[in-house]
Amino acid sequence: HWRCHAQSTSENPESKLYAFENGCKAVKAHYDRIGIPAEVEQGPFYGMYRTHYLWKEQPLVSILIPNKDHAADLKKCMDSIEEKSTYRNFEFIIVENNSTEEETFAYYKEIEKRDNVRVLYYKEDFNYSRINNFGAKEANGEYVLLLNNDTEMIEPDSIKEMLDVCMRPDVGIV
């Protein structure tokens, strides 16, 4: 049984906004105790909090994209990241897997001119895990982001948001 009245946060969250302000302070104090540089603010709903990590480093992220033909999809994927991402320290590793269309190889020639793009050739039968492992061995980044070639960036901060969580010493994968 839960009692609700006009001054209770269960009935009206705005009745005690200080409770949510104290929630922010508690989360911030936790980060301070464990040595994670961060700021905390109210989230979109009462009782939810948003963390902004304040890392000094901006490590290289290797974006691995397996591809077989579908040059238009790959271009759309890469262009969306190049145009929208607020995080700029990344490289693309395209893992080519038995394409046959000339336009695909023409696109590879075009993108290989960029400093942050490499095309690797995986000549075995399709196996998503093996293809990604093959690409990861060649990655220069400290962090690896696995994407499909038909993925498009929607939120400009998505790479930074994932990286921020992944950089925590108690996190291994996001």
Residue ranges and their predicted role:
Residues 122-139:
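Glycine-rich, basic loop-to-helix element that forms the pyrophosphate-binding segment
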Residues 96-107, 124:
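A conserved acidic beta->alpha catalytic loop
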Residues 151-174:
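Conserved donor NDP-sugar-binding/catalytic core segment of glycosyltransferases
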Residues 144:
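Short aromatic/hydrophobic "clamp" motif used to bind/position activated sugar donors
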Residues 65-76, 87, 98-99:
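Active-site beta-to-alpha loop of glycosyltransferases that engages the nucleotide-sugar donor
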Residues 59-64, 91:
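Cell-envelope/extracellular polymer assembly enzymes that use nucleotide-activated donors
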Residues 79-89:
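Short, acidic, metal-binding catalytic loop of nucleotide-sugar glycosyltransferases
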Residues 13-38:
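Catalytic core of nucleotide-sugar-dependent glycosyltransferases
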